[in-house]
């Protein structure tokens, strides 16, 4: 399935049905009074969050959606049938913006949440409404209301408790595959991860959701590489796990580059709690590990944890620390 997190679609409510011009007809009654019924209300357009969905792919190829029109009024004071509302399901984490993307109309953060974005048009009045002492046989009726229409922008921000960040090939996908049942594509070259991957981590009787974000490179917040497109998916998370490739010649530069991209993208990311991990320690000597940890701790003023996603050394400790950090923020 394609991962689609940005779409623009057209939506329109159903028009109201027209009122009816009709007169009562009955045997032995030549001139019955007006009995034209009202038009039915048009259907509304409603968005609903659905936890079974994780992409906006349903809106990639079909981009025009219109609710059902109300039926016209009928004789014998019968109202037209109301049009069916159109319910459009979206993943949790979907945001609805105006066409230009400047106005947030709604943000879905829980399952089975509904938002009526367009009301259907009101039905027109039948001629029975216009009978008066001076006009016993009115031929007046009103037309149904034309419903609102608009283009909107849908943007999906994945909901996760923990975000995995780091340079391409830092070992994020391997980390995710070990701590969850997720099966991300893994290979020994940069940009293996082309879309965000989500997984659920179970710790005893507790759990949390973790997201592997495609690797960041210098200039990601300006659209370079893949990071700019996916940085938004970790804005909602509580904790960042920052993996650094221990085999790199300059771990401090790698750390600073990723931090700059996070800080340049938004203040939300800048202020996230960060767990720093020096990965691939299985290919380093004890002296090399300590030297690189010392360098990182000097510039970060934070504890740096040595791990190996190849041997899984130290990974369980990070998982428990992440869970503890999440719980402390609740």
Curated annotation (Swiss-Prot):
Give the superkingdom in one word. Answer: Bacteria
User: Single GO cellular component annotation?
Assistant: cytoplasm
Subunit and interaction comment: Monomer.
The catalytic activity of this protein is classed by the Enzyme Commission as 3.6.5.-
**Binding-site positions, Mg(2+):** 173, 193
Primary enzyme class? hydrolase
| Domain spans labelled OBG-type G | 160-327
Species source reads Rickettsia massiliae (strain Mtu5)
Q: Which residues bind GTP?
A: 166-173, 191-195, 212-215, 279-282, 308-310
Question: Which regions span the lipid bilayer?
Answer: none
Gene3D superfamilies annotated for this entry? GTP1/OBG domain, P-loop containing nucleotide triphosphate hydrolases
Its predominant location is cytoplasm
Q: What is this protein called?
A: GTPase Obg
A single GO molecular function term of this UniProt record: GTPase activity
A GO biological process of this protein is:
ribosome biogenesis
Any idea where this protein resides?
Answer: Cytoplasm
Cofactor(s) this protein requires? Mg(2+)
Q: What does this protein do?
A: An essential GTPase which binds GTP, GDP and possibly (p)ppGpp with moderate affinity, with high nucleotide exchange rates and a fairly low GTP hydrolysis rate. Plays a role in control of the cell cycle, stress response, ribosome biogenesis and in those bacteria that undergo differentiation, in morphogenesis control.
Provide the alphabetized UniProt keywords.
Answer: Cytoplasm, GTP-binding, Hydrolase, Magnesium, Metal-binding, Nucleotide-binding
């Amino acid at each position: 399935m394609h991962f689609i997190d940005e779409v623009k679609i057209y939506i329109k409510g159903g028009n109201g049905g027209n009122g009816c011009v009709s007169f009562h007809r009955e045997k032995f009654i030549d001139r019955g009074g007006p009995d034209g019924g009202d038009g039915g209300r048009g259907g509304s357009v409603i968005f609903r969050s659905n936890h079974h969905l994780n992409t906006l792919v349903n809106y990639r190829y079909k981009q025009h959606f219109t609710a059902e029109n109300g039926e016209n009024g009928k004789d014998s004071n019968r109202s037209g049938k109301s049009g069916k509302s159109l319910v459009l399901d979206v993943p949790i984490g979907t945001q609805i913006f105006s066409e230009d993307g400047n106005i947030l109309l709604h943000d879905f953060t829980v399952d089975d949440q509904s938002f009526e974005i367009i009301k259907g048009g009101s039905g027109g009045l039948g001629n029975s409404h216009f009978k008066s002492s001076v006009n016993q046989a009115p031929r007046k009726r009103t037309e149904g209301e034309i419903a609102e229409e608009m283009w909107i922008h849908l943007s999906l921000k994945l909901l996760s408790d923990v975000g995995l960040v780091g340079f391409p090939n830092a070992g994020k996908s391997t980390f995710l595959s070990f701590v969850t049942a997720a099966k991300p594509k893994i290979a020994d070259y940069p940009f293996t991860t082309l879309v965000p991957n989500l997984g659920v981590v179970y710790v005893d009787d507790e759990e949390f959701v973790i997201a592997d974000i495609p690797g960041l490179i210098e200039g990601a917040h300006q659209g370079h590489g893949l990071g700019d497109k996916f940085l938004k998916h970790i804005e909602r998370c509580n904790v960042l796990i920052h993996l650094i490739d221990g085999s790199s010649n300059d771990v401090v530069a790698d750390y600073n580059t990723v931090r700059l991209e996070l800080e340049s993208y938004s203040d939300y990311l800048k202020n996230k709690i960060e767990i720093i991990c020096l990965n691939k320690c299985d290919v380093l000597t004890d002296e090399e590990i300590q030297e690189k940890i010392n360098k990182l701790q000097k510039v970060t003023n934070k504890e740096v944890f040595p791990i190996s996603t190849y041997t899984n050394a130290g990974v369980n400790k990070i998982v428990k620390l992440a869970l503890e950090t999440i719980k402390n923020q609740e």
